[in-house]
Amino acid sequence: MTRLQEKYQKEVVPAMIEKFGYKNIMEVPKLEKIVINMGVGEAKENQKVLESAVNDLTLIAGQKPVLTRAKKSVANFKIRENMPLGCKVTLRKANMFEFADKLMSIALPRVRDFRGVSSKAFDGRGNYSLGIKEQLIFPEIEYDKIDKVRGMDIIFVTTANTDEEARELLRFLGMPFAQ
């Protein structure tokens, strides 16, 4: 059991029951999955760029990402249908908690001028989206080995019904929200 899973069961669940007055322990929202997406626009000209993005994401997430492809051809963007344009990885269970712990305790504090993440990026259904501008904040990525600084989107999918519940869940887990 990971450190964050233990914290969830021992501290977060009782705190959420107290705050929201759940009658059943199964009503307490939990993290369902974390999706990390890396869109690589330059991949349309150079497939090698996509390979390095896949390698970076493999190091960061600890599992191999799946390629994302263009849904339809767009002449203005010079892309064809089914052309690989990025990669994404879906983390669940232990991998998800390991990544969330690493993100909140190590990676986010390494961001330049970090004052906390926005608390307005909830989607209305209890899911939280977070954009990162550079992959260098993760300890697995070596500065000398990267060819280009790339960003990524990280989506926390929870079982919470409202944004308020999801915000409290993530706050109790240790997400550094800006005041």
Swiss-Prot record:
PROSITE patterns: RIBOSOMAL_L5. InterPro entries: Ribosomal_uL5 (IPR002132), Ribosomal_uL5_bac-type (IPR020930), Ribosomal_uL5_C (IPR031309), Ribosomal_uL5_CS (IPR020929), Ribosomal_uL5_dom_sf (IPR022803), Ribosomal_uL5_N (IPR031310). This is one of the proteins that bind and probably mediate the attachment of the 5S RNA into the large ribosomal subunit, where it forms part of the central protuberance. In the 70S ribosome it contacts protein S13 of the 30S subunit (bridge B1b), connecting the 2 subunits; this bridge is implicated in subunit movement. Contacts the P site tRNA; the 5S rRNA and some of its associated proteins might help stabilize positioning of ribosome-bound tRNAs. Pfam families: Ribosomal_L5 (PF00281), Ribosomal_L5_C (PF00673). The keyword Ribosomal protein applies. Belongs to the universal ribosomal protein uL5 family. This is Large ribosomal subunit protein uL5. One of its GO terms (molecular function) is structural constituent of ribosome. HAMAP family: Ribosomal_uL5_B (MF_01333_B). Part of the 50S ribosomal subunit; part of the 5S rRNA/L5/L18/L25 subcomplex. Contacts the 5S rRNA and the P site tRNA. Forms a bridge to the 30S subunit in the 70S ribosome. One of its GO terms (biological process) is translation. Keywords: Ribonucleoprotein, Ribosomal protein, RNA-binding, rRNA-binding, tRNA-binding. Disulfide bonds: none annotated. One of its GO terms (cellular component) is ribosome.
